[in-house]
């Protein structure tokens, strides 16, 4: 980095573990910031060093839980009031992204509201990864650098040296993402068509494609309760798959996800570290995205191309 004094990296409570890795990759210290929590549940943010005239990068995933979003908004507000030259929100996991449209009457569009809140608070740029819906980028009137976890997942899949490999998606909605993987690796694509009884409950699932005697890698963006991904794995094995493993960008893993993954037929469940995972599940593995975000920050500071590096 040519001028380390021209930018500073700070972190909210939720993503400090990742921010420390990003700073280690950049070769810069993590900025000193204080978040004070009060007895009534409110909290306040203060920067413990000057950020006047600096490009300020704020690392914080906005969910889970909702306090992380409010914490980020206060970080943005404090940076603006402290005369930062520019404020860049680095949101590895953009919470509320599954609320990206009206899918029935009289419902909120949470992703648009969060975009508005961040914009009004004062960010000049957003760096995020694997949005649940690409069109969320259009909710902002500022530059959005949309990174892809495929940059870390594809080398990992290649390192497994799996024969008779197929890429699969646990639902038709993820076919575009899975298709990118299958084309890059030069292997077949298999789809699962699911129906839901209600939220987080999968009723039926059918396979579109051949998995007999294949090593299957399921590709998804978010694993929440793990109902879909584990059911897909079971259906694949019942159809004659040799092995099934899964990769997903964001490790939400709400209860009873850890139990479901542990008891499932999945060989492993691989995530990025966009969200910390503290629960015990031997099958869960996390690959770090710190170097990818660090390189993106470096390119933003130096006005270099980002898309040429990360979009495949």
Language model features with spans:
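PRPP-associated nucleotide enzymes
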Residues: 1-312
């Amino acid at each position: 980095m040519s001028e380390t004094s021209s930018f500073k990296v700070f972190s909210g409570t939720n993503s400090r573990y990742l921010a420390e890795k990003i700073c280690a990759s950049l070769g810069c210290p993590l900025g000193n910031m204080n978040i004070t929590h009060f007895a009534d549940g409110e909290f306040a943010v203060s920067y413990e060093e000057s950020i006047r005239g600096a490009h300020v990068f704020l690392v914080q995933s906005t969910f889970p839980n909702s306090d992380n979003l409010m914490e980020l908004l206060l970080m943005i507000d404090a940076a603006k009031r402290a005369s930062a030259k520019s404020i860049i929100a680095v949101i590895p996991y953009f919470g509320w992204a599954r609320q990206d449209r009206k899918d029935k009457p009289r419902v909120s569009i949470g992703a648009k509201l969060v975009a508005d809140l961040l914009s009004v608070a004062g960010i000049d740029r957003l760096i995020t990864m694997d949005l649940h819906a690409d069109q969320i980028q259009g909710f902002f009137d500022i530059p959005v650098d949309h990174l892809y976890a495929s940059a870390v997942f594809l080398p990992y899949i290649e390192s497994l040296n799996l024969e008779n490999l197929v890429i699969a998606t646990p639902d038709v909605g993820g076919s575009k993402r899975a298709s990118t993987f299958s084309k890059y690796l030069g292997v077949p694509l298999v789809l699962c068509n699911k129906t839901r009884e209600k939220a987080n409950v999968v009723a039926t699932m059918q396979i579109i494609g051949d998995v007999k005697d294949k090593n299957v890698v399921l590709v998804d963006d978010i694993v929440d309760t793990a109902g879909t991904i584990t059911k897909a794995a079971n259906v694949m094995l019942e159809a004659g798959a040799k092995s099934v493993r899964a990769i997903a960008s964001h490790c939400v893993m709400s209860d009873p996800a850890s139990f479901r993954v542990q008891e499932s037929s999945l060989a492993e469940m691989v995530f990025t570290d966009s969200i910390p995972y503290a629960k015990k599940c031997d099958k869960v593995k996390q690959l770090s995205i710190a170097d990818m975000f660090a390189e993106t920050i470096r390119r933003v500071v130096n006005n270099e191309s980002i898309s040429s590096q990360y979009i495949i």
